[in-house]
Regions:
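A general structural motif
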Residues: 96-98
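C-terminal catalytic histidine-bearing segment of alpha/beta-hydrolase fold enzymes
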Residues: 52, 67, 82, 100-178
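Accessory cap/linker subdomain of secreted extracellular hydrolases
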Residues: 1-94, 108-112, 124
Length: 178
């Protein structure tokens, strides 16, 4: 639906539709060369077309979805929840205690529902249980929300790494910024 809102304010007010963002990308460059969000997704997660350029998930002029590209992206890992569900027996053991997500509950690009689905899956894991965390910015926190400064986030990450570092692994130098 080209007139669907693609970007909104944290209060839920429309900022830009799919059509508007698609037109902006077309004006910035054709054949996946705008260097904007949609073209980046297509180049990163989509297949290469016969012409050597990334195939588009949807036609930026008409909004028509290319189902082959959608299937390719899902099967190749663009859908993180699907990838984790499909591969949990193999990759789950190496991810235990390592997945910690921060997100606003009113993401500008409608990503919060996908995060809720990811959390539902991870909370259902067994053998092994994922052992991570989800923190939501509420009420009405948008894209890029985090509950701390970047410096505080780095300190939290350093403490986590130090806590789980292999026995005897030196961590003092990098924790103190040397």
């Amino acid at each position: 639906a080209p007139e669907r809102t693609m970007q909104m304010t944290p209060e839920g007010q429309p900022m830009a539709t799919m059509r508007q963002i698609s037109q902006m990308e077309l004006a910035s460059g054709t054949r996946g060369r705008s260097a904007a969000q949609i073209d980046v997704w297509n180049a990163t997660y989509g297949p290469v077309g016969a012409d050597g350029y990334p195939r588009q998930l949807w036609d930026l002029r008409t909004g028509v979805i290319d189902r082959e590209v959608a299937t390719y992206m899902r099967e190749k890992g663009y859908d993180l929840r699907h990838y984790l569900e499909t591969n949990w027996p193999r990759i789950g053991p190496s991810l235990v205690g390592k997945l910690h997500l921060l997100t606003g509950d009113m993401d500008d690009f409608h990503l919060a529902p996908a995060v809720y689905l990811l959390e539902d899956f991870l909370e259902s894991t067994k053998a092994p249980y994922y052992g991570g965390s989800f923190r939501y910015g509420r009420p009405m926190k948008g894209h890029g929300w985090q509950p701390m400064t970047n410096a505080d986030l780095l300190r939290e990450m350093a403490a986590h790494i130090a806590r789980y570092a292999p026995a005897g692994e030196p961590t003092r130098d990098w924790r103190e910024g040397r």
